[in-house]
């Protein structure tokens, strides 16, 4: 006999809504003008050197089911395959680190399954080579060995799509260079984030990123990950949130994660996430895509609700 208390019923209703929250959004809205929950280093549920490398406690499918719609993907090339990493730390599908390293195909299996079950949704897929070598080759491998096997699942234009254009698809953001000798069409290789500048210094200001191509758009990015958690919140995250207002033509990306100090991402998130949870968001304001470590249903719901 299973007894459903009021709290359990409320929890189940919230989860059901989170997995398909975009179904309630008018398809004429631009995806990147929505307030979107995202996960930083989303593949790190099972990862080497977990104290400093683990940023998530759920797999990709579970994150998407929780309402996450933006994934921060880090890869390295191994032969003709792309493997999942966080810096030098390898990511795996299970706790067994002697098993095979997680492949891009494993990540996409989660994404495709979720979109097949929830065709009203879309996934923003920020792709980065984290190995500091073979930068252009990683995009070649991604395009030819993964994307082109299921092209109908991908939105590859170099512009911000409307939701109706992207439902049931993955929006590719290319945060790496590509081989210009291959004759790729810049307009069909994803939203171009190849000019991304790593925010490696402890300076509180966000940075501007302009995409290339005929549909150039401007992003304001806050990712000052070198701070310890308390100054990270007080000097970077909160002032950036305080500066938000209604949409003004610039797209926003805001990272709540930090690698500063010796406590590691999990302990850092235990300080920052409650601060964000108690911060009042204005439903009329544009906050952009917010990437988090160890999100909860309360955190994703907080962001999602500002769209309604």
Question: Where do the protein language model's features map onto the residues?
Answer:
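Intrinsically disordered, low-complexity acidic segments that are enriched in bulky aromatics
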Residues: 98-143
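Surface-exposed substrate-engagement region within the catalytic domains
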Residues: 148-284
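C-terminal domain-boundary segment and adjacent tail
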Residues: 146-166, 291-308
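Active-site periphery "cap/insert" segments of enzyme catalytic domains
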Residues: 82-90, 100, 131-151, 160-163, ...
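Long, acidic (Asp/Glu-rich), low-complexity accessory segments flanking structured domains
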Residues: 14-70, 77-117, 170, 174, ...
């Amino acid at each position: 006999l299973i007894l459903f208390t009021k709290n359990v019923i409320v929890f189940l209703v919230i989860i059901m809504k989170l997995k398909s929250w975009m179904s309630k959004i008018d398809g004429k809205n631009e995806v990147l003008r929505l307030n979107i929950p995202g996960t930083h280093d989303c593949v790190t549920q099972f990862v080497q050197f977990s104290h400093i490398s683990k940023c998530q406690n759920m797999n990709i499918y579970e994150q998407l089911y929780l309402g996450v719609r933006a994934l921060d993907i880090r890869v390295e090339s191994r032969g003709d395959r792309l493997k999942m990493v966080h810096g030098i730390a390898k990511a795996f599908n299970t706790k067994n680190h002697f098993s095979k390293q997680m492949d891009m195909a494993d990540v996409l299996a989660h994404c495709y399954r979720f979109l097949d079950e929830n065709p009203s949704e879309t996934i923003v897929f920020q792709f980065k080579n984290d190995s500091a070598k073979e930068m252009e080759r990683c995009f070649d491998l991604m395009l030819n060995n993964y994307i082109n096997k299921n092209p109908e699942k991908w939105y590859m234009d170099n512009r911000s799509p409307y939701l109706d254009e992207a439902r049931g698809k993955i929006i590719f953001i290319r945060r790496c260079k590509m081989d210009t000798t291959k004759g790729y069409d810049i307009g069909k290789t994803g939203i171009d984030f190849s000019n991304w500048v790593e925010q490696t210094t402890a300076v509180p200001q966000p940075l501007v990123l302009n995409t290339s191509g005929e549909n150039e758009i401007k992003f304001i990015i806050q990712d000052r990950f070198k701070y310890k958690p308390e100054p990270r919140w007080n000097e970077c995250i909160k002032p950036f949130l305080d500066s938000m207002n209604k949409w003004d033509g610039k797209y926003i990306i805001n990272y709540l994660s930090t690698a500063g100090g010796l406590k590691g991402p999990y302990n850092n998130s235990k300080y920052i996430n409650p601060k964000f949870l108690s911060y009042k968001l204005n439903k009329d304001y544009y906050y952009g895509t917010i990437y988090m470590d160890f999100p909860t249903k309360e955190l994703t719901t907080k962001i999602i609700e500002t769209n309604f």
